UniProtKB/Swiss-Prot annotation:
Database matches in PANTHER family: ATP-DEPENDENT DNA HELICASE REP (PTHR11070:SF64), UVRD / RECB / PCRA DNA HELICASE FAMILY MEMBER (PTHR11070)
Molecular function (Gene Ontology), one example: 3'-5' DNA helicase activity
Binding, ATP: A22, G23, A24, G25, S26, G27, K28, T29, R278
One of the protein's GO biological processes: DNA replication, synthesis of primer
Domain UvrD-like helicase C-terminal: 281-562
Quaternary organization: Homodimer in association with DNA.
Annotated InterPro entries: DExx_box_DNA_helicase_dom_sf, DNA_helicase_UvrD-like_C, DNA_helicase_UvrD/REP, Helicase_Rep, P-loop_NTPase, UvrD-like_ATP-bd
Name of the protein this chain belongs to: ATP-dependent DNA helicase Rep
GO cellular component: cytoplasmic replisome; cytosol; DnaB-DnaC-Rep-PriC complex; primosome complex
Ranges for domain UvrD-like helicase ATP-binding: 1-280
Keywords, ordered alphabetically: ATP-binding, DNA replication, DNA-binding, Helicase, Hydrolase, Isomerase, Nucleotide-binding
Length: 673
């Protein structure tokens, strides 16, 4: 498929800073992959001097595959395509000495972070889960805004902020002592390093001579600063973004970063991609008219050559049960009449709690469905167990990982033994693993617990020595040496479950082997690099799934970003739901409108909205108003369902069940042919 004029211009402009305003479905990934090919083939850039950065592993993998298909593996070798956090990790791995760190650092995931902060804040924060989560978010926001603990303390206003800043200082000191980083450090540390160290900054500016950034509207303060530091005064970069799809301000994203670009880089070239290759003209008209109610610095209007398309429907329901019943009935009928696949349908909602009643009706009618936000491969207990072992092998200072593995499988090392070991280690400023080898420890510990601990740590030290010479053999010996398979069969609910879990362990081992050996496209990695890469993938892939089965997709509007479906149901189109009540209270309607815009532009062929006349909220019955966003849409393109005569709940239930029963009978007859 040939590039359209806007895409062609975006690909060929390489002489200065470039902002590509890419509307929904406008083919931005094609632009990025073609631009990389143009830089290498047409402009003389070497692949190793080009970096492309995006926000999810899935997007990075897709980009890598497309570039590989366009250029071939040999030409693309050395090209850096990754997420922001993986790029940050690469900088830290190469510059650990300048950061005052040891090379064998490891990464904390959110479970480790929560456990550590719970321990550190004992006596400072009552056992309050909500307050603890607020502390985690506050520390994350401080790091995203490039604030160190001392700066956070200096700018603290009020008692709560002062306590939080103190906790941040304790947390930061503990991470440094354990040679551990958390997720936000992967951007914070490289950014501060490049700000403060001219030699390192010049080295990376020379290494990355052209930078491409996708989903730029999702960048936060530290990511924007990192981009500026990497491109320097040369300013050879392309950022691709859409201010109308900025929906992550709650996690630090700043859509104003798009506007700041033109101030920081006055020579900025702005190129708009307005042709949409996804949706019908009618769907785009609705999206354009809705989003026009937001203030804009950059005006754009999406258009399509895919035809005007079907009218948009608005279905009214008596309550949430009726809403789910109606959507399920409509979906079954549409599927039967149009001979579609279930994966062609998406049910999108504002909050996760809205999914339950839809699950109930889909399940009752044996409709296969999938809720996005499932368990990442790397979040599975057996994978986290093995990664914890590897974290201790590569970073003996990682107490969090040590405590996870010390009794997995069971080794009769009891809590009293671990408590004494922890106290011994703390007084000597050592990690628990390192302290376990101290000669004097036998005076504090004795008996079976001490013997079991010594056996375990000496065995692990042997594996550690082998890992330095033969990492693949070491991991194989580790899995066999702890007899993990037997442990899985003992602790899993069924032999089948144990078999599946062991299959996951073998899959991880297979991936590790590939990464340690390297490939045509990727250099061989060290065991430390492999472990940190896997830990990072777990943190970034929560909710991502590679499987694409024939299932109706249920997901939040936030989770739907970047996806497309032929038939979309946007449910709960009421004031208080979309826009969300907290946004109404805080007068932050613009972002909620962008969220509705994202939902509308997921639909390719047909779009149906639903709303309820009554809903139960916090045990009370409320009668919500229709969403203002429905009223902002072009009414000529909407079919509002006509009011029907009021029927009792019993009659409606009987009628609905009868309708669904008829549809199921038709489907059963069809299957029986």
């Amino acid at each position: 498929m040939r590039l359209n004029p806007g895409q062609q211009q975006a690909v060929e402009f390489v002489t200065g800073p470039c902002l590509v305003l890419a509307g929904a479905g406008s083919g931005k990934t094609r632009v990025i992959t073609n631009k990389i090919a143009h830089l290498i083939r047409g402009c003389g850039y070497q692949a190793r001097h080009i970096a492309a950065v995006t926000f999810t592993n899935k997007a990075a993998r897709e980009m890598k595959e497309r570039v590989g298909q366009t250029l071939g593996r040999k030409e693309a070798r050395g090209l850096m395509i990754s997420t922001f956090h993986t790029l940050g990790l690469d900088i830290i791995k190469r510059e650990y000495a300048a950061l005052g760190m040891k090379a064998n650092f490891s990464l904390f995931d959110d479970t480790d972070q929560l456990a550590l902060l719970k321990e550190l804040t004992e006596g400072l924060i009552e056992d309050d889960k909500v307050l603890l989560q607020q502390l985690i978010s506050t520390i994350s926001n401080w790091k995203n805004d490039l604030k160190t603990p001392s700066q956070a303390a200096a700018s603290a206003i009020g008692e709560r902020d002062r306590i939080f800043a103190h906790c941040y200082g304790l947390y930061d000191a503990h991470l440094k002592a354990c040679n551990v980083l958390d997720f936000d450090d992967l951007i914070l540390l490289p950014t501060l390093l490049l700000q403060r160290n001219e030699e390192v900054r010049k080295r990376w500016q020379n290494k990355i001579r052209y930078l491409l950034v996708d989903e730029y509207q999702d960048t936060n303060t530290s990511q924007y600063e990192l981009v500026k530091l990497l491109v320097g005064s040369r300013a050879r970069f392309t950022v691709v973004g859409d201010d109308d799809q900025s929906i992550y301000s709650w996690r630090g994203a700043r859509p104003q970063n798009l506007v700041l670009l033109s101030q920081d880089f006055p020579a900025l070239k702005v190129i708009k991609l307005e042709q949409n290759y996804r949706s019908s003209g009618r769907i785009l008209k609705a999206a354009n008219i809705l989003i026009a109610n937001n203030p804009h610095v950059f005006e754009k209007r999406l258009f399509s050559e895919l035809g005007y398309g079907a009218e948009l429907k608005v279905l009214s329901a008596n309550n949430e049960e009726h809403e789910a019943e109606r959507v399920t009935g409509e979906l079954i009928a549409h599927h039967f009449v149009n001979k579609t696949q279930y994966k062609d349908y998406a049910i999108l909602y504002r909050g996760n709690h809205q999914s339950r009643v839809f699950e109930k009706f889909l399940m009752q009618n044996r409709i296969p469905y999938k809720i996005s936000g499932g368990t990442s491969f790397f979040s599975r207990p057996e994978i986290k167990d093995l990664l914890a072992y590897l974290r201790v092998l590569t970073n003996p200072d990682d107490d969090s990982a040590f405590l996870r593995i010390v009794n997995t499988p069971k080794r009769e090392i009891g809590p009293a033994t671990l408590k004494k070991l922890g106290e011994w280690a703390m007084t000597r400023n050592k990690s628990m693993f390192t302290a376990s080898f101290d000669m004097g420890l036998s005076q504090t510990l004795s008996g079976r617990g001490y013997e079991a601990l010594t056996r375990f740590t000496h065995w692990l030290a042997e594996i550690q020595r082998l890992a330095e010479r033969e990492p693949i053999a070491a991991v194989r010996d580790l899995i066999h040496g702890m007899d993990y398979e037997s442990w899985l069969y003992e602790t899993s609910p069924s032999p089948k479950a144990a078999e599946m879990r062991m299959k996951n362990v073998n899959q991880l081992f297979s991936w590790m082997t590939e990464m340690l050996e390297g490939s045509e496209l990727d250099e061989p990695m060290t065991l430390t690099q492999v472990v940190t890469r896997f830990t990072l993938r777990d943190m970034m892939e929560r909710g991502e799934s590679e499987e694409e089965l024939d299932q109706v997709q249920l997901m939040t509007l936030h989770a739907s970003k970047g996806l497309e479906f032929p038939y979309v149901y946007m449910v709960g189109m009421e004031e208080g739901f979309l826009p969300h009540q907290s946004s109404i209270d805080e007068d932050n309607i613009d972002e909620e409108r962008r969220l509705a815009y994202v939902g509308i532009t997921r639909a390719q062929k047909e779009l149906t909205f639903t709303l309820c006349k009554e809903r139960r909220q916090y045990g009370e019955l409320v009668r919500p108003e229709p969403s203002r966003f429905l009223l902002e849409l072009p009414q000529d393109d909407l079919i509002w369902e006509q009011e029907r005569k009021v029927v009792s709940a019993e009659e409606r239930m009987q009628k609905g069940q009868s309708h669904l029963a008829n549809l199921k009978a038709m489907m059963a007859a069809k299957r029986g042919k």
